[in-house]
Amino acid sequence: ANRILENQATVDGLTGCLNRRGMENRLDEVQHGFGRGGVSERITLVLFDIDFFKQYNDTYGHLAGDDCLKTVASIPRSMAQNSKDFVARYGGEEFVVVLVDTSLKDALVFAERMRTRIEQLGLPHTGSRISQVVTISVGVASAGNCDNDATNLIKCADEALYQAKGAGRNRVAYMSDQGRVVTL
């Protein structure tokens, strides 16, 4: 019974991903698993959201929106290689992928593959101003390039995501080791 309650408290019922609370718990576990209380330099956070998702819901309805969220979430879940990696629904149409023991370079390859695979799903999206299919914008940050805690890692990834959106969406941006956001 306790396991069921814990699962309900930490897993998003729609997508099967961790929810925000579950993500914070797992990130804390990973963080403390490396000792010293700081985030490992080998943790990379990939933050993404679905471009023009509100318009998607307005165009196709909330049931279709739910199906879109489930389908999009399944892509990074199927791509995660390391048993310590995890995917969480951060809120609304925003998701986080935490890649453990992954360099920034490898995380960027992961992010671009994920972006491409989601676009190639071909989910129709006539409400999008950039494409006729569902796309995502992605921000990537590595613990080695941000202040050494989970809150700052998320903040760095969010800055990169904001830059990806500002550069036209449907792209990946990342926080460089010089503290600048670079768009691919």
How would you name each of these model-derived features?
Residues 100, 104-112, 128-129, 141-184:
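Catalytic-core segments of nucleotide cyclases and related cyclic-nucleotide turnover enzymes
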Residues 6-25, 48-62, 70:
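Conserved nucleotide-binding and Mg2+-coordinating catalytic segments in signaling enzymes
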Residues 132-134:
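PAS-family sensory domains
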Residues 4-7, 20-42, 73-82, 100:
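Short regulatory alpha-helical coupling segments
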Residues 86-89:
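A short pre-motif secondary-structure segment
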Residues 73-77, 106-125, 158:
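Alpha-helical scaffold within the catalytic cores of cyclic-nucleotide enzymes
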Residues 44, 137:
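Cell-envelope/extracellular polymer assembly enzymes that use nucleotide-activated donors
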